[in-house]
């Protein structure tokens, strides 16, 4: 009986997805070679892009991050959300 119970516990642990965390690109650069593990509760990868006007003219800005929810798009702001590892490249 103890062997059966132990077997069931082991099978349950193996079959469960214990502690999976999302991997997302997290940077403020145009290219982003590295990824980071998202904190608990943030299982969406986000890529935001917009054009910033500075003294040297317009420049495309991009920010990649982990998020709990997909933020809304706004005028002049493009938002891309996804739910697989490093999908916000």
UniProtKB/Swiss-Prot annotation:
* Sorted UniProt keywords: Cell adhesion impairing toxin, Disulfide bond, G-protein coupled acetylcholine receptor impairing toxin, G-protein coupled receptor impairing toxin, Hemostasis impairing toxin, Neurotoxin, Platelet aggregation inhibiting toxin, Secreted, Signal, Toxin
Q: In which tissues is it expressed?
A: Expressed by the venom gland.
Main location per UniProt? secreted
Instruction: Fetch the CDD domains from UniProt.
Output: TFP_snake_toxin
- A GO molecular function for this record? toxin activity
Q: Which residues form a coiled coil?
A: none
Q: Which cysteines are joined by disulfide bonds?
A: 24-45, 27-32, 38-66, 70-81, 82-87
- Chain span(s) of sequence motif Cell attachment site: 54-56
Keyword check for Disulfide bond, yes or no: yes
Pfam families referenced in this protein's UniProt entry, alphabetically: Toxin_cobra-type
Signal sequence, start to end:
1-21
What does the UniProt entry say about where the protein is found? Secreted
Q: Which Gene3D superfamilies match?
A: CD59
GO cellular component terms, A-Z: extracellular region
Concerning its family, UniProt says:
Belongs to the three-finger toxin family. Ancestral subfamily. Orphan group V sub-subfamily.
What's its job? Answer: Exhibits M2 muscarinic acetylcholine receptor (CHRM2)-blocking activity, but has a weak binding activity toward nicotinic AChR. Moreover, it inhibits collagen-induced platelet aggregation.
Stated name of the protein: Gamma-bungarotoxin
**UniProt lineage:** Eukaryota, Metazoa, Chordata, Craniata, Vertebrata
């Amino acid at each position: 009986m103890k062997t059966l119970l132990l077997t069931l516990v082991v099978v349950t642990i193996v079959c469960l997805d214990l502690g999976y965390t999302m991997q997302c690109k997290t940077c403020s650069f145009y290219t982003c070679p590295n990824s980071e593990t998202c904190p608990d509760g943030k299982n969406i990868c986000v890529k935001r892009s917009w054009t910033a006007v500075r003294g040297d003219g317009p420049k495309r800005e991009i920010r990649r991050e982990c998020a709990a929810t997909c933020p809304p798009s706004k005028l002049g702001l493009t938002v891309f959300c996804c739910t697989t590892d490093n999908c916000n490249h």
